[in-house]
């Protein structure tokens, strides 16, 4: 319902009640997921895992980015998903250096890094996962990029725990990339909440003033992007617990095809 509709009908529906606008109340309530919500997101993540397993081998057959995106979405629907969480990202070669590239007509070729960022939607709830695969032999720089991003992502996941500031999770990832000399090539925040929307509170970044709590569901997705080499991003969706977190997205993080 729009604000104009609410104003038009409020007097008829609730003549004795004053409706007071709120700012952030619903968004705050939505941060903590109950068991039913987490169950849907767990199932959605499993569908995305299975879809990637079914399609991954196709990367070596010189498909276009758009063909891989279409096949992933078809596989998720075949497995019972209502559809993709968002427009599937398949970014190959130089396109991998653009964090939000959309799948296009470029053919995936030998030596390409391929960044695949996608998820399944089930009964309104979403998953989000990124894997990077190298087709053929990586260059020395690309291999190092992968190792650094994987280490950063693992450090970020290990930092997730109820009571931890989101900025501390961001720093856990960012410090690994900073030590490698690529801090300026980490072009975005470390993650975000996810649920009914693919991006919701809490935002996992250096500037965010929020603390993780039991039942929050967030992503951890560091990346390094170098135009002359492509890009690497690795992402998981995790459920925050009192003693750490539980990873929902479980597809292997193997670099090589």
Predicted regions located by residue number:
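Active-site neighborhoods and metal-handling regions in enzymes and metal-associated proteins
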Residues: 1-257
């Amino acid at each position: 319902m729009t604000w104009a509709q609410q104003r038009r009908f409020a007097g008829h529906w609730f003549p004795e009640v004053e409706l007071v606008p709120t700012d952030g109340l619903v968004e705050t309530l939505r941060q903590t997921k109950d068991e039913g919500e987490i169950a849907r997101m767990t199932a959605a993540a499993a569908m995305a895992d299975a879809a990637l397993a079914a399609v991954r081998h196709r990367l070596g057959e010189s498909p276009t980015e758009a063909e891989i995106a279409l096949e992933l979405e078809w596989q998720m629907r075949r497995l019972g998903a209502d559809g993709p969480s968002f427009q599937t990202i398949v970014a190959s070669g130089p396109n991998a250096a653009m964090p939000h590239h959309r799948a296009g007509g470029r053919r995936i070729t030998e030596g390409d890094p391929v960044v695949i960022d996608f998820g399944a939607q089930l009964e309104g709830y979403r998953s989000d996962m990124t894997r990077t695969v190298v087709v053929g032999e990586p260059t020395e720089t690309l291999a190092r990029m992968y190792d650094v991003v994987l280490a950063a992502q693992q450090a970020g996941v290990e930092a997730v725990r109820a009571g931890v500031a989101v900025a501390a999770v961001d720093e856990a990832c960012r410090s690994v990339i900073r030590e490698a000399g690529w801090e300026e090539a980490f072009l975005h925040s470390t993650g975000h909440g996810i649920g009914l929307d693919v991006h919701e509170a809490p935002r996992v970044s250096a500037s965010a003033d929020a603390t993780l709590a039991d039942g929050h569901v967030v992503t951890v997705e560091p990346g390094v992007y170098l135009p002359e080499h492509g890009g690497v991003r690795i992402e998981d969706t995790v459920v925050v617990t009192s003693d750490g977190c539980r990873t929902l997205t479980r597809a292997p993080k193997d670099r090589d095809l």
